[in-house]
Amino acid sequence: MRLFIIDTVATVIFFTAVATFSELLIAGMAPSEVLATRLLMVPVMVLTGRPYTRWRDWLVRRTAPRNRWSAFLTDILAFLSFQAPVYGATLLIAGASFAEAGTAIGSAIILMILLARPFGLFVEWTRSLFGVELS
């Protein structure tokens, strides 16, 4: 339960900060729209935060990255293989067509690649703050 809480809080903090920046400064959304979007995304992050970090932990143990480059690639593989399907399902549930979802996922992959390692490092840092180490 402790790891669930730590990983979920790390997920909510990291992606709320990144998405808020993106929505305000890149997408040009109004602060009220950003707030509404972020509040709607909290349940999604709560549902997917620990399952993602569990998947990432398994992949890290399985691949045993030996240097920064392999750790970077492992985080990208973990992030893309988990988050792209979640994002696609979210888009389809929200009413996007398959073509729209495909386009959105295609463009989001660039951001996913850029965010994968920083998020992995943030989760590891957050765990270390609370004295959690994985075997």
UniProtKB/Swiss-Prot annotation:
Keyword terms of this UniProt record: Amino-acid transport, Cell inner membrane, Cell membrane, Membrane, Transmembrane, Transmembrane helix, Transport
Record Pfam families: AlaE
Disulfide cross-links: none
GO BP annotations listed: amino acid export across plasma membrane
MF annotations from Gene Ontology: L-amino acid efflux transmembrane transporter activity
UniProt xrefs under InterPro entries: Ala_export_AlaE (IPR010574)
One GO CC term on file: plasma membrane
Compartmental location: Cell inner membrane
Gene: alaE
Topology relative to the membrane: Multi-pass membrane protein
Family: Belongs to the AlaE exporter family.
Entry's transmembrane regions: 9-29, 75-95, 96-116
Role played: Exports L-alanine.
Designated name of the protein: L-alanine exporter AlaE
